[in-house]
A protein has these predicted regions:
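Active-site nucleophile loop of the alpha/beta-hydrolase fold
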Residues: 188-198
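Conserved hydrolase catalytic core segment
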Residues: 175-185
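C-terminal motif of bacterial Sec signal peptides marking the signal peptidase cleavage site
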Residues: 18-19
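Gly/Ala-rich beta-loop-alpha elbow adjacent to hydrolase catalytic centers
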Residues: 165-169, 173
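Short, surface-exposed "cap/lid" segments of acyl-processing enzymes
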Residues: 74-125
C-alpha cells in the first residue's frame, strides 16, 4: 500500500485537473488539428539535407498567419550562418530553441558567434514551426534525437562543437553535453532546469487524458516566431526534459565551461534553484552566471549581477524571453513590429497597454500601481551579456 499511494495521488490530481479544464472553449481551426504527416525525424547525413527536408515539410503543413509565406518559412526553418573570418573553420555551435518557439529565437545571438568565427546552425524541434497541435503526439525522444543527429553531423565535419539552448532547449543541450565529453562548452539562456510551478509533474499524467488546457482564440495567434498556446503534452515533454537534466547533473557535474543567464523575475523558471545548481554542479572555473535583478545571495565569484530595473527605458524587470534579443531587433526590439501587450490574464491590462503611449516593460504578470506594462522582449544589456558569454572559452 505504501508504494501505491503516491501514484494514486498523482492520478487523482490529474483527473481533478481534467475536471477543472473541461469547460474551456475549444475551437474548430487548423491550428488545433495535427498535420496529416509528421515532421521527418530520421537520421540525416548532412545539415543541408535536414534543412531542405524541414522546409519542404513546413511548406506543406504550416498554418500560415500572413500572406508572406516565404518570411514565415524563413523564421521557422533551421538556419546556418557561415563565419565571417576568412581562416578555416574549426569550431561550430548548435542552437536549440524553447517550447513553442522557433529557430529564429537565436537570430541575434547566432550572429555574434558567427562574427567570432563559429559555424552556426540551429534546429527545429519536432512539433514546432507548423501548428500548435503538432506538439500533441511528440515525445522527448523526438527532441533528443534531433539534437544528437545534428551534433553527430557537425562532429563528422571535423569541428569542435559547442551547444546553446533557450529554456527547454537549454535542458536538452545540457543533458546531451553532460553525456558527451567532446562538447566544448554550453551557452544557456533562461535554462528551465526547474519549473516555477509546484504541479508541473502532473502534466504527463494529464496529457494522457486531454490535449488542451487552453487553446485561445485563433485570431490571437499572430506571432510569426512562436506559438501563442501549447497543448498539455508540450508541457509534459518539457517536464521530462527538466527531470532528465536534473538527474544528469545529480549523477555527474558538468566540468567544461558553461555560460548561464537568468532573470530574477522569470515567470516560468525557478531561478533560485538554477543558481544553486550552477554553484554546485557547474564546476569549471571559467564558467559564468549572469543574474538580471536584485543582487543575488551567493558567494560564488563566477556570478555577475545586472540591475534589471532600468527607468530610463521604462523597464521594471526582465522577462523569460527578453534575454535573447537586441534592443534594435526588428520584431521584438524597443521599436519592434510586435509589442506584447498581452502580459497578464487580465483583459483590462491588455486594453490599457494598447491605449498607452508610453507603457512600461516587465516580466509576465508584473503589476505596479500607476503603471501600464507590456512584456519586455529585448535585453538592454545584450552586448555586455555576450561579452561574458564569449569570455568562457577562446578561439
Amino acid at each position: 500500500m505504501k508504494f501505491r499511494f503516491k501514484p494514486l495521488i498523482i492520478i487523482v490530481c490529474a483527473l481533478l485537473l481534467i475536471g477543472c479544464i473541461s469547460s474551456e472553449q475549444e475551437y474548430d481551426h487548423p491550428l488545433y488539428d495535427t498535420s496529416t504527416s509528421a515532421l521527418p525525424v530520421q537520421q540525416f547525413d548532412s545539415f543541408l539535407e535536414y534543412q531542405q527536408t524541414v522546409q519542404t515539410w513546413l511548406e506543406q503543413n504550416r498554418v500560415f498567419l500572413q500572406d508572406d509565406h516565404a518570411a514565415e518559412l524563413s523564421y521557422n526553418t533551421p538556419f546556418e550562418i557561415m563565419p565571417n573570418q576568412a581562416n578555416s573553420v574549426k569550431k561550430g555551435i548548435i542552437f536549440v530553441h524553447g517550447l513553442g518557439d522557433s529557430p529564429w529565437s537565436f537570430v541575434d545571438v547566432a550572429k555574434e558567434f558567427a562574427d567570432d568565427g563559429y559555424l552556426v546552425r540551429s534546429v527545429l524541434l519536432p512539433g514546432h514551426g507548423s501548428r500548435p497541435a503538432d506538439l500533441v503526439p511528440i515525445s522527448i525522444s523526438d527532441w533528443e534525437n534531433t539534437v544528437k543527429n545534428q551534433v553527430e553531423i557537425m562532429q563528422k565535419e571535423g569541428l569542435e562543437v559547442s551547444l546553446s539552448g533557450f529554456s527547454t532547449g537549454a535542458n536538452l543541450v545540457t543533458d546531451y553535453a553532460n553525456s558527451d565529453p567532446s562538447i566544448e562548452a554550453l551557452y544557456l539562456f533562461s535554462p528551465a532546469f526547474k519549473s516555477d510551478s509546484d504541479i508541473d509533474f502532473l502534466a504527463p499524467a494529464g496529457a494522457l487524458f486531454v490535449d488542451w488546457v487552453f487553446q485561445g482564440d485563433p485570431q490571437n495567434h499572430n506571432n510569426l516566431m512562436k506559438y501563442n498556446s501549447v497543448p498539455l503534452n508540450g508541457f509534459a515533454q518539457y517536464y521530462w526534459t527538466s527531470y532528465e537534466v536534473q538527474k544528469s547533473l545529480e549523477r555527474k557535474p558538468f566540468d567544461r565551461p558553461a555560460f548561464l543567464a537568468v532573470t530574477q523575475d522569470d515567470s516560468v523558471v525557478n531561478v533560485t534553484e538554477v543558481l544553486k545548481l550552477f554553484e554546485t554542479q557547474f564546476t569549471n572555473a571559467n564558467s559564468r552566471f549572469i543574474w538580471f535583478g536584485d543582487k543575488p545571495d551567493t558567494l560564488d565569484k563566477r556570478v555577475v549581477h545586472f540591475d534589471s530595473r532600468v527607468p530610463s527605458k521604462r523597464i521594471s524587470n526582465f522577462s523569460h524571453m527578453s534575454l535573447l534579443y537586441r534592443e534594435d531587433n526588428f520584431y521584438y526590439g524597443a521599436n519592434g513590429k510586435f509589442p506584447m501587450c498581452r502580459n497578464s490574464t487580465d483583459p483590462l491590462d491588455y486594453e490599457a497597454c494598447l491605449n498607452s503611449d508610453e507603457p512600461w516593460y516587465s516580466a509576465w504578470g508584473y503589476k505596479e500601481e500607476g503603471k501600464v506594462h507590456a512584456r519586455l522582449t529585448y535585453n538592454p544589456y545584450f552586448d555586455e551579456m555576450l561579452d561574458y558569454a564569449k569570455s568562457i572559452t577562446a578561439l
